[in-house]
C-alpha cells in the first residue's frame, strides 16, 4: 500500500527550494494554481494568517520553515539573534491560534536550538529540523492512511460511500493528507466507491479544495451543500464520516472546521460512524477539554460580500472558523501512533505517553 500511495501522489502545497518557502496559494484554487515565494518570516506569518496555506499540519510545517528564514535574517543583522528570534516565534504563534500543530512545530524548533552544540552551524541545524518536521508529517500521513482503511475494512468489507468535510488532504499537510489520505488508500484498495464532499462554508474548502484534489486523482466525488448533509446520510447509504482535526483536547474533544460538530450530531442520529484522522501532534494534553481550545473567529467581511454584491448593511456577523465536537460523538481517532476508539482522557494519555521500542 505504501508504494501505491507514493506512486499516486499528485498534489503538494509546500516546497522548500533555494532557501525560500514556496506555497501553493489556496485562496485561488481551483481556478488558478499560483505559487507564492516567501523569503522572510513576515511573509510566512502573513501567508498563514491570510490562508494562503491552511490546515493544521501544513501551518506547522510552514512556521518551521519561517523560523529558518527568521534566523537567517537575524544572523545577517548581527546583535543578539537569540533574543531577537523570540519576536519571530511570537509573530508566527499569533498567526492562527487554534492549530495545535503550529505550537508543536514552534516548540520543536525551540528545543532544537536548546540542544545546539558549540561546534554546530545553527542555521544548518534549524533548517534540517524544519525538513525533518516536513518529512515526519508525510510519513505520519502514510501510516494513518493504512490504519484508517484497515479500520473501515474491519467494519464492512465491501466498497462504501464516505462523507468528508473541509479539506484534510495533501493541501492541508506535508504529504497525502489525513482524512483524504484514508480515502485515497480506500479507493486504491477498492474499499471506497464514492466520496461525498460538503462544500464547507464560508471558505468553501470542500468545493474548492477537496473536490479538486479528489477529481485530480480520478476518485469519484460528489459535491453537496452543507445544508444537504443530514439528508445525504439518510438517503445515500453513507457508512463513515471521515474528517481531520486542528486540535484535540486531552479528553478527546476535537476542534475542527466549523460545521463539523453538527455533522457529528447528524452522524450519531443516523447511525453513521464518525472518524477523526489527525497526527498525534494535534493532541494537546495541556487542554483538558474542548472548552479550553482557543477558537478563532475571522473578519465579518468574509460573510458580507456575495459575488460582489454586498449583504444587508450594518448587520452583525458571527464568523467562527472552528467548532468543538465532543468526544462522545466520535467513534474513533486515527493517529500515526495508533487508533483510539471511543476516545477519552485515559486512552489519549496512554497513546501519547506510550514508550516506543524503536
Curated annotation (Swiss-Prot):
EC top class named in words: isomerase
GO molecular function terms listed in the Swiss-Prot or TrEMBL record: S-methyl-5-thioribose-1-phosphate isomerase activity
Active site as annotated: 246
Catalytic activity: 5-(methylsulfanyl)-alpha-D-ribose 1-phosphate = 5-(methylsulfanyl)-D-ribulose 1-phosphate
Pathways involved: Amino-acid biosynthesis; L-methionine biosynthesis via salvage pathway; L-methionine from S-methyl-5-thio-alpha-D-ribose 1-phosphate: step 1/6
Keyword Ion transport: no
Record-listed substrate binding positions: 54-56, 96, 205, 256-257
Keyword set, alphabetical order: Amino-acid biosynthesis, Isomerase, Methionine biosynthesis
Assigned EC number: 5.3.1.23
Coiled coil start-end: none
GO biological process: L-methionine salvage from methylthioadenosine
InterPro entries: IF-2B-related, IF-M1Pi, IF_2B-like_C, Initiation_fac_2B_a/b/d, M1Pi_N, NagB/RpiA_transferase-like
S-S pairs: none
Superkingdom: Bacteria
Described purpose of this protein according to its UniProt entry: Catalyzes the interconversion of methylthioribose-1-phosphate (MTR-1-P) into methylthioribulose-1-phosphate (MTRu-1-P).
Family: Belongs to the eIF-2B alpha/beta/delta subunits family. MtnA subfamily.
Full protein name: Methylthioribose-1-phosphate isomerase
Name of the gene encoding the protein in the UniProt record: mtnA
Amino acid at each position: 500500500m505504501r508504494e501505491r500511495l507514493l506512486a499516486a501522489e499528485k498534489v503538494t502545497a509546500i516546497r522548500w527550494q533555494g532557501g525560500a518557502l514556496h506555497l501553493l496559494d489556496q485562496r485561488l484554487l481551483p481556478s488558478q494554481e499560483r505559487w507564492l515565494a516567501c523569503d522572510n518570516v513576515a511573509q510566512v506569518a502573513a501567508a498563514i494568517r491570510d490562508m494562503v496555506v491552511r490546515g493544521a499540519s501544513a501551518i506547522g510545517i510552514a512556521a518551521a520553515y519561517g523560523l529558518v528564514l527568521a534566523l537567517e535574517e537575524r544572523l545577517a543583522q548581527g546583535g543578539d539573534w537569540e533574543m531577537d528570534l523570540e519576536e519571530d516565534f511570537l509573530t508566527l504563534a499569533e498567526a492562527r491560534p487554534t492549530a495545535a500543530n503550529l505550537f508543536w512545530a514552534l516548540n520543536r524548533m525551540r528545543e532544537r536550538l536548546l540542544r545546539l552544540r558549540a561546534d554546530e552551524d545553527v542555521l544548518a541545524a534549524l533548517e534540517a529540523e524544519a525538513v525533518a518536521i516536513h518529512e515526519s508529517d508525510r510519513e505520519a500521513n502514510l501510516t494513518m492512511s493504512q490504519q484508517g482503511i484497515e479500520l473501515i475494512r474491519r467494519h464492512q468489507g465491501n466498497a462504501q460511500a464516505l462523507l468528508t468535510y473541509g479539506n484534510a488532504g495533501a493541501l492541508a499537510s506535508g504529504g497525502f493528507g489525513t482524512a483524504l489520505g484514508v480515502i485515497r488508500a480506500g479507493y486504491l484498495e477498492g474499499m471506497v466507491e464514492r466520496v461525498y464532499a460538503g462544500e464547507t462554508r464560508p471558505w468553501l474548502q470542500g468545493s474548492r479544495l477537496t473536490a479538486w484534489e479528489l477529481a485530480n486523482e480520478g476518485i469519484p466525488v460528489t459535491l453537496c451543500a452543507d445544508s444537504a448533509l443530514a439528508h445525504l446520510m439518510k438517503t445515500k447509504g453513507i457508512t463513515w464520516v471521515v474528517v481531520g482535526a486542528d486540535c484535540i483536547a486531552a479528553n478527546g474533544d476535537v476542534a475542527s472546521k466549523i460545521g463539523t460538530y453538527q455533522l457529528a450530531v447528524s452522524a450519531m442520529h443516523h447511525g453513521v460512524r464518525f472518524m477523526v484522522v489527525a497526527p498525534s501532534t494535534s493532541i494537546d494534553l495541556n487542554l483538558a477539554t474542548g472548552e479550553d481550545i482557543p477558537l478563532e473567529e475571522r473578519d465579518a467581511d468574509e460573510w458580507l460580500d456575495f459575488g460582489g454584491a454586498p449583504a444587508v448593511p450594518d448587520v452583525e456577523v458571527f464568523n467562527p472558523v472552528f467548532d468543538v465536537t465532543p468526544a462522545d460523538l466520535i467513534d474513533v481517532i486515527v493517529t500515526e501512533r495508533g487508533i483510539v476508539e471511543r476516545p477519552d482522557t485515559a486512552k489519549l494519555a496512554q497513546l501519547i505517553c506510550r514508550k516506543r521500542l524503536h
